Design a protein with these regions (language model features):
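Active-site His/Glu-centered metal-binding helix of metallohydrolases
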Residues: 19, 98-110, 160, 164
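Acidic helix-start/capping segments at beta-turn-to-alpha-helix junctions
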Residues: 31-46, 58-65, 120-123, 182-189
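Catalytic zinc-binding patch centered on the HExxH motif and its immediate surroundings
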Residues: 62-76
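Catalytic Zn2+-binding segment of zinc metalloproteases
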Residues: 91-92, 102-118, 130-131
């Protein structure tokens, strides 16, 4: 059911569509069709598990930004940045993040916040769909929406969306610990770098609260180990060759050295320090490897485990063809 005072479903969809155009201009869509389809498939699977979808269509997009961020717009638009994709360590974590953003949409957090801040302009538009005649007014609304998405929606709304994301991802067959795992590794990253994910700052008093609540809810829902149904390797295989760092948005004119994410299979006898030395030429990069892979500094990698590593330069696909054993002959 649609429940935002003074706003019709059509208006809410139009608000999202207007701001979507600005986001696409501001960041650009990451040009990797296979990865876009992969994220969209996970997102649409989550939407299919909702008891009430609220909106007829949902869109999931990776935007070309090195910021660590995910955000949603009214009407069914969900975005994750390249920076966030690089931080995520399993499909279950990504499902938790996408489910959280779907929560913002179905609870109308963005639209309600807009009504509180610029309700009079939205009311003046009524149900009018964007057209050249009222383009100026729509621009005001979509600009305000664009500015607000990065500010988060306050403690209650974030926890409500965390819960929705955990429930939704579990219904879609994922470990409910994905969300808390992602929040924990993000907190480690933020403590190191001071970078923040929307409404999730290391200095924010509610950060630990969110991690604890997400972990408790997941624990109540599942008696399995934390890494059950995480689909970590499946996610990491998709990530190989992902552009790393680079521009924050279209206004970022700095020259960025090309870097990408590679996937390394741990060998017998490897430690994080030895991998850092062997693969990156600097054993002090071991901390970077543990943080990026959501691991505690005190832990050690296990043989056969896959790890993300950052490499300089542009990604080159394997030169060798992977021939599958015993190919099935075509039916005559």
């Amino acid at each position: 059911t649609h429940s935002v005072p003074f706003i019709s479903q059509e208006t809410e969809i139009a608000m999202g569509k207007g701001a979507d155009e600005q986001i696409t201009r501001q960041y650009g869509i990451y040009q990797n069709k296979e990865l876009q389809l992969y994220v969209n498939r996970i997102g649409q699977n989550l939407v299919s598990k909702l008891s009430d979808k609220i909106f007829p269509r949902y869109y999931f997009r990776i935007v070309d930004s090195s910021d660590i961020n995910a955000f949603a717009l009214p009407g069914g638009y969900v975005y994750v940045t390249l920076g966030l994709m690089a931080m995520v360590n399993s499909e279950a974590e990504l499902a938790g993040v996408l489910g959280h953003e779907i929560g913002h949409i179905i609870f109308h957090h963005g639209a309600k916040q807009m009504v509180r801040s610029i309700g009079s302009q939205i009311l003046a538009l009524g149900g009018a769909i964007a057209s050249p005649k009222n383009a100026g007014q729509w621009l005001t609304v979509s600009t305000a929406m664009f500015q607000q998405i990065n500010m988060g929606y306050g403690r209650e709304a974030e926890i409500e969306s965390d819960e929705q994301g955990i429930l939704n991802s579990m219904e879609a067959g994922y470990s409910p610990f994905g969300m808390s795992g992602f929040l924990k590794s993000l907190r480690r990253k933020e403590i190191m770098s001071g970078q923040a994910y929307h409404s999730f700052q290391a200095s924010h008093p509610d950060t630990r609260d969110r991690i604890v609540k997400a972990g408790l809810l997941a624990g109540r829902m599942s008696d399995k180990e934390e890494d059950g149904n995480s689909y970590r390797n499946r996610y990491l295989h998709q990530l190989r060759g992902l552009k790393y760092k680079g521009q924050k948005n279209s206004g970022d004119k700095k020259r960025h050295e090309p870097m990408y994410i590679d996937i390394y299979e741990v060998q017998k006898g490897d430690t994080f320090q030895s991998i850092a030395e062997k693969e990156m030429g600097n054993r002090r990069k071991d901390l970077d490897i543990t943080v990026m892979n959501g691991r505690k500094e005190s832990s050690q990698p296990k043989p056969g485990e896959l790890l993300k590593l950052v490499r300089k330069g542009k990604f080159k696909k394997d030169k060798f063809l992977h021939i599958k054993p015993n190919p099935i002959p075509d039916p005559k």
